[in-house]
Amino acid sequence: MTPPGGEKPPYGEIFSVMMICCMAGTRLFGFLAERDPPEKFSRGLFAVAACALATPVALPGRPTWALAGFLAFELVVGAYFPAMGTLKSKIIPDAQRATIYNLFRVPLNVIVLLVLLSHLDTVQVFTAVVALLAAAAALQHALYVATVDYSKRVVAIESDKEPLVAV
């Protein structure tokens, strides 16, 4: 992303704008959470993140578009963390939450280490990340369908119950 003339990009300004997008993402979460549960709108977050990170691969040599893709990704990241925190609090019991998080931390660190040692080029890395984000969107959709089906079953069971009558 070197600007014309070979001068260095304004890294401080780029970082600042990315952090602003991340903060705006938390506001986006608040806006979305007022209308729908995180199970529903998180599917879109993953899809937008995949499209945003596909931008540098799809449009090589266009730094402005790459920056726009990264800013869109940071916006999604800002909405992702509160959405996943809400989902985790709904799904994972408090007593087991720390243990479960720690179980996933070790494999995650091993995966990061293997990726760093593999010396993949940028296009391969972005392509893999886009594929993983698309898979995350599909899995989030499966979670949403499962929770909607479960909610419908609970409502159906509760509506079939006869009211208690005092004798």
Describe each model-derived feature in a short phrase.
Residues 1-6, 26-36, 54-58, 109-137:
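Transmembrane alpha-helix termini and helix-breaking/packing motifs in multi-pass membrane transporters
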Residues 6-15, 62, 66, 101, ...:
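Juxtamembrane helix-start elements in MFS-like secondary transporters
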Residues 15-30, 45-46, 69-117:
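Substrate-agnostic recognition of the 12-TM MFS/MFS-like secondary transporter fold
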Residues 37-45, 100, 125:
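Juxtamembrane helix-start motifs in multi-pass secondary transporters
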Residues 39-81:
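C-terminal transmembrane helical hairpin of 12-TM major facilitator-type secondary transporters
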Residues 127-167:
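Multi-pass alpha-helical transporter architecture, strongest
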